[in-house]
Regions:
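C-terminal motif of bacterial Sec signal peptides marking the signal peptidase cleavage site
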Residues: 2-5
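Compact, glycine-rich, soluble single-domain proteins
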Residues: 7-158
């Protein structure tokens, strides 16, 4: 698994176990949906995120989506930490693009990215995953680089 598990005692090996056939699927994308918690101090915020694990799913991302709920998002895991670059081509709504280190801490946040922009949004260092949320949500919830931590309650592998 790329990010730490939500439950104490969950091992990395169990985090890499294939998801059961009954895994929740998103009605629009068909992608697996997992629980993800962002911790900021003692505050824990729960999200249901789609896992864009395949190259095709990562290339499409949230293109053409017209809405994204406050507790919804999409995560783009990497097999190994690597520099990541995203753009907003064909993306209708503003997004917060959150770059996540292998230990689950936030490396950086690109707030309220501009819809349809072809300007690359890049990580400042190699990252293990990228989380996209509704634009403005990271600031509203006071997520901060290095002080906020993501925890996955599902399989996060590519």
């Amino acid at each position: 698994g790329l990010l730490a598990a939500c439950s104490p005692g969950t091992t990395t090996a169990s985090a890499q176990t294939p998801a059961p056939a009954t895994a929740a699927r998103h009605p629009v994308s068909g992608l697996e949906v997992i629980d993800l918690v962002v911790e900021r101090g003692t505050q824990k915020l729960a999200f249901k995120v789609e896992v864009a694990a395949s190259p095709e799913a990562q290339a499409k991302g949230l293109m053409f989506r017209t809405s994204l709920g406050d507790n919804e998002g999409m995560i783009f895991p990497s097999a190994v930490p690597e520099p990541r670059s995203f753009w907003m081509k064909n993306t209708v709504i503003p997004l917060d693009i959150i770059f996540v280190r292998a230990d689950g801490t936030i490396e950086s946040i690109a707030d309220n990215t501009v819809p349809y922009s072809m300007t690359p949004v890049v990580s400042g260092e190699p990252v293990a995953a990228v989380l996209e949320l509704r634009g403005g949500l990271a600031a509203q919830k006071a997520f901060r680089a290095s002080t906020s931590c993501l925890r996955s309650c599902g399989r996060l592998s590519r």
